[in-house]
């Protein structure tokens, strides 16, 4: 984009998406208006690239920080990718099996998991997505940028936090915990984007609702928390908007 005046980073679930995880026509129009005003819109999400392609097409947004900062896609190109080692995947897999949970593995092309349970189905129903294919050892031959422990809220969360201090865990919903490398976040994704593209002095705006948006707010000049946002995020916000189900982005 020539003569970029600002950059706006949008979380998806609970923010840009409506209550059924869809992009409304009003949001598509709002994104077009941002572009007309030389404001670059980017998605910043815990989801991965392959599962947000319909969202990107519907919204008109062609760049994204995905998997909580582990991967950056900018105008059709990969400009950053942080991958787990096979040994890290094996270790987490072993601990997850011991606790009776399942594990999902993410890269930009696909999602696969260790098994299907009621909790796994609930986790993906919660975000209106299909349950991933079962491929328990897919990490042996495929890249893994992010993992999810599929477990009920509060069910052994501390067990993982204590045993893997080198990782960061985000409990973003009642049925899953996002796992990224320590120090990686949506905020680090913003910094990596700016460093790679040589962007300096451009105002930044962050829109979000979840705990994983705290780092995004810290990395941007202005933070707009949705009305349905976590209280921790509202406390850090420059402005508090209405709920995502009340469709406020189109009025900005």
Predicted regions and their residues:
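Short acidic-hydrophobic, aromatic-tinged amphipathic segments that line or gate anion-handling sites
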Residues: 133, 240-243
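Conserved small/polar residues in nucleotide/adenosyl-binding loops
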Residues: 250-251
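Conserved acidic, metal-coordinating active-site core of Asp-based
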Residues: 95, 99-207, 211-216, 228
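Active-site phosphate-binding/coordination module
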Residues: 19-119
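Hydrophobic residues within well-ordered alpha-helices
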Residues: 34, 68, 190, 216-217
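Asp-based phosphoryl-transfer active-site loop
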Residues: 6-20
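Non-catalytic pre-domain segments flanking phosphatase-related domains
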Residues: 1-10, 199
């Amino acid at each position: 984009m020539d003569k970029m005046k600002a950059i706006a980073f949008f979380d998806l679930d609970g923010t840009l998406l409506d209550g059924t995880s869809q992009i409304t026509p009003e949001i598509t129009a709002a994104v077009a208006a941002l572009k007309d005003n030389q404001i670059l819109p980017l998605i910043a999400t815990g989801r991965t690239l392959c599962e947000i392609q319909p969202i990107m097409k519907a919204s008109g947004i062609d760049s994204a920080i995905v998997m909580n900062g582990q991967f950056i896609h900018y105008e059709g190109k990969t400009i950053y990718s942080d991958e787990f080692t096979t040994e890290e995947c094996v270790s987490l897999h072993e601990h997850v099996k011991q606790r009776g949970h399942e594990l999902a593995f993410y890269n930009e092309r696909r999602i696969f998991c260790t098994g299907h349970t009621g909790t796994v189905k609930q986790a993906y129903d919660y975000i209106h997505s299909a349950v991933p294919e079962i491929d328990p050892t897919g990490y042996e031959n495929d890249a893994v940028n992010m993992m999810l422990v599929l477990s009920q809220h509060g069910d052994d969360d501390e067990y993982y936090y204590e045993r893997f201090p080198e990782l960061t865990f985000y409990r973003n919903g009642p049925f899953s915990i996002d796992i990224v490398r320590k120090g990686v976040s949506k905020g680090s994704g913003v910094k990596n984007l700016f460093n790679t593209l040589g962007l300096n002095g451009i105002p930044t705006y962050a829109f979000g609702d979840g705990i994983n948006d705290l780092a995004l707010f810290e990395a941007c000049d202005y933070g707009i928390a949705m009305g349905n946002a976590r209280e921790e995020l509202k406390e850090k916000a420059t402005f508090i908007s209405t709920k995502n189900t009340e469709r406020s982005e189109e009025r900005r």
